[in-house]
């Protein structure tokens, strides 16, 4: 039996009808489990495309949520892989919520060290698969909510779960990042060395606070490595997760991400531009 199973489909990704290939890929993990994934391939690129891995939030899947970001990155010339984290997907979240209620159920999942260890194996499986296709010249990890926690952990943030990683990416993008609380101590972000873009919204509420609490992750980062914080007026938690993403927020979020990453790929820290309804900070 083949260890790697590919299911190919074609999806209309652009409003004007331009088609991009989409692969459903089952990636073999180091522990023998399978990581279901969706690969968004760029239409045309010279050589090997840069790589972006996408990590969903608690209760998400490879098919729900961050599709909008995968599509945008593919249009921008990236190979984007949306990972399906089974150990922190919807069935697991429902089980925790039935046992402990809504708030405590989510808290139980986002503080489960084993769930993050499984996510790290998902990430390693995707990196191994992508490397077998070609050597990506630039690698980025992006995530939303629990996926943003995963991003911070992979980048080297201190944490209360006893987790360590090897920081295999050139840059990171955190949508709805977590501030200090049940996962991160107040000095969590100081060890992070890589460039990072953080995006939140004024209605982006979390377990331990609102957008100002989320912004503390940016405050905790050191300066000098192209760190940006973007705050979108009126944007909610679900907007960034893609489950309730109005075109207005979709356009702004994907534009920020692609502009930031394109600048880094070209060898400089981009100068993002503030606009009505968008507040930016950098260091």
Question: Which ranges hold each PLM region?
Answer:
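Primarily recognizes the serine-hydrolase "nucleophile elbow" in alpha/beta-hydrolase
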Residues: 126-191
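Alpha/beta-hydrolase-fold serine-hydrolase catalytic core, especially in secreted/extracellular enzymes
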Residues: 234-235, 241-283
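Bacterial N-terminal signal peptides
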Residues: 7-15
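The feature captures the conserved acid-bearing segment of alpha/beta-hydrolase catalytic domains
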Residues: 164-234
């Amino acid at each position: 039996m083949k260890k790697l199973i590919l299911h190919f489909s074609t999806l209309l990704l652009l409003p004007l009808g331009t088609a991009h290939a989409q692969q459903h890929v089952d990636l073999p993990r180091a522990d023998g489990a399978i990581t279901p994934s969706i690969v968004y391939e760029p239409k045309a690129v010279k050589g090997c495309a840069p790589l972006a891995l996408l990590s969903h939030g608690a209760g998400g899947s490879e098919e729900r949520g961050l599709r909008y970001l995968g599509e945008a990155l593919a249009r921008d010339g990236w190979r984007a892989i949306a990972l399906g984290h089974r150990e922190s997907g919807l069935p697991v979240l429902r089980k925790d919520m039935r046992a402990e209620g809504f708030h405590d159920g989510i808290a139980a999942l986002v503080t489960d060290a084993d769930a993050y260890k499984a996510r790290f194996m998902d990430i390693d499986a995707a990196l191994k698969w992508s490397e077998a296709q070609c050597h990506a010249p630039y690698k980025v990890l992006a995530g939303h909510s629990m996926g943003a926690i995963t991003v911070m952990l992979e980048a080297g943030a201190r944490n209360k779960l006893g987790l360590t990683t090897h920081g295999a990416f050139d840059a990171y993008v955190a949508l709805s990042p977590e501030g200090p609380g049940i996962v991160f101590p107040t000095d969590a972000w100081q060890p992070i060395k890589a460039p990072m873009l953080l995006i939140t919204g004024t209605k982006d509420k979390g377990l331990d606070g609102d957008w100002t609490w989320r912004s503390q992750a940016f405050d905790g980062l050191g300066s000098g490595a192209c760190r940006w914080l973007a705050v979108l007026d009126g944007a909610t938690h679900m907007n960034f997760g893609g489950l309730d993403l109005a075109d207005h927020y979709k356009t702004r979020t994907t534009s920020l991400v692609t502009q930031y990453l394109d600048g880094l790929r070209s060898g400089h820290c981009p100068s993002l531009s503030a606009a009505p309804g968008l507040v930016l900070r950098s260091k």
